[in-house]
């Protein structure tokens, strides 16, 4: 959607917050 910072880092490439994905900056964002 609009990029929303989930407040979660994803060093291992996994986001635990529902609907969030790991971007190239290793930060979880929601679409």
Swiss-Prot record:
Cross-link (Cyclopeptide (Gly-Asp)): 1-31
UniProt xrefs under Pfam families: Cyclotide (PF03784)
Keyword Transferase annotated: no
PTM notes: This peptide occurs in both cyclic and linear forms.
InterPro entries: Cyclotide (IPR005535), Cyclotide_moebius_CS (IPR012324), Cyclotide_sf (IPR036146)
SUPFAM superfamilies with a match to the protein in the record: Cyclotides
Keywords: Disulfide bond, Knottin, Plant defense
Disulfide bond sites: 6-20, 10-22, 15-28
Source species, domain of life: Eukaryota
PROSITE patterns to which the protein is assigned, alphabetical: CYCLOTIDE_MOEBIUS (PS60009)
Family: Belongs to the cyclotide family. Bracelet subfamily.
Role this protein plays: Probably participates in a plant defense mechanism.
Description of its domains: The presence of a 'disulfide through disulfide knot' structurally defines this protein as a knottin.
Name of the protein in question: Kalata-B9
Organism in which the protein naturally occurs: Oldenlandia affinis
């Amino acid at each position: 959607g609009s990029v929303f910072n989930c407040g979660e880092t994803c060093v291992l490439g996994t986001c635990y917050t529902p609907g969030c994905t790991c971007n190239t900056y290793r930060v979880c964002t929601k679409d």
